[in-house]
Structure formats: structure tokens, C-alpha cells
Regions:
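Eukaryotic small-GTPase/lipid signaling interfaces
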Residues: 1-174
């Protein structure tokens, strides 16, 4: 019955979710291979968020119209929700931070009706920068490690000693 409502857009979302999940696993693999040396991790995570914001706000170097901005927003929102539902929390948190970035929040365009609800669900599940995403870290400790990919963004806040990461994200508009 639900097959008649399936579209190429759904296939694209699924493809991107799978690719992002592989990327998350690659980041974990690289950390493991480097003996958990995380000195470059904050730069990599910041670059991921910044590049996602750039992708959201661009249309193949052409002038961005609201129509394309809305399409990009809707697409990344769907990828975030699907990643969240499939326990790829690195991707979900990165997209959440991109979608709620001040560069995106400040733009005047119509968001999808259910966008705020999806963002609120993710935000409430993870906690805030001010709480160092303690809800996510607490949840991570209780989950099955085989299927659950925790967010390195949240985890790295507990590794950095002087809350430099929290300060940087606040300065970036979060």
C-alpha cells in the first residue's frame, strides 16, 4: 500500500542517509586507527557543520531562490529525521546544528509545517550546548553499541577540558 507513495526523492534521502552513516563509521574508524588522537576532531566537526550550511544555502553557484532554499531545507530536514530514527546521531546532530544555525534561522522563508516539531524532538533528545548535550551522552551510555552511533560533537565536549568547544559553538550562533 505504501509503495504507491514512494518517490525518487525518498530514494535520494535514503541514499544520503546510508552515505552519512558510512561517513560516521569512517570518522570512528579514523579515530580508532589514530589511537583516539582527537586534536583535529573539532576542526573536522566544525567543517562538517559549516559545509552543510553552505550546501543548504547554495544552488550550484547560481543565485539562490527561495524555492531552492525550501527544497534544500526540506531535504536536509528529512535526512536529519531519518538519521535520528536510524540511530546515526552524529549525522542527525550535525544536520540539526546546520538547520538551526543563525545563518539559516535568520532567513525569511516558509519552513515545512512539521519542521519545528522535528527540530524540537531532536533538540530535546540531545539537550543544549549549555548542558553539554548531557541528555545525549546519558542516553548513549544505555544504548546497544552495535546499532547506535553517538554524536562525536556531544562526546567531544566532555573530552575538551576548558569548554572551548561549547564557546566556539556559541560564537557560531548556537
Amino acid at each position: 500500500l505504501f509503495g504507491c507513495f514512494h518517490s525518487p526523492w525518498d530514494d535520494r534521502v535514503e541514499q544520503v542517509v546510508k552515505a552519512c552513516r558510512l561517513s560516521t563509521k569512517s570518522i570512528y574508524g579514523e579515530l580508532w586507527a589514530n589511537g583516539m588522537d582527537i586534536k583535529d576532531l573539532p576542526k573536522m566537526l566544525d567543517a562538517g557543520i559549516t559545509n552543510t550550511v553552505k550546501l543548504l544555502l547554495t544552488n550550484d553557484r547560481k543565485k539562490m531562490k527561495k524555492k531552492y532554499l525550501m527544497q534544500n531545507y526540506r531535504f536536509f530536514l528529512a535526512v536529519m529525521k531519518s538519521s535520528f530514527d536510524s540511530n546515526d546521531h552524529q549525522t542527525a546532530m550535525m544536520l540539526y546544528m546546520a538547520l538551526t544555525h543563525m545563518s539559516v534561522e535568520g532567513l525569511d522563508f516558509k519552513r515545512p509545517k512539521k519542521a519545528q516539531g522535528k527540530l524540537d524532538t531532536v533538540g530535546k533528545t540531545y539537550g543544549s550546548v549549555e548542558s553539554c548535550y548531557n541528555k545525549h551522552v546519558t542516553e548513549m551510555l544505555r544504548e546497544n553499541v552495535n546499532d547506535y552511533l553517538p554524536s562525536l560533537i556531544a562526546c567531544s565536549m566532555y573530552v575538551n577540558k576548558h569548554d572551548a568547544y561549547a564557546k566556539a559553538f556559541k560564537n557560531m550562533g548556537h
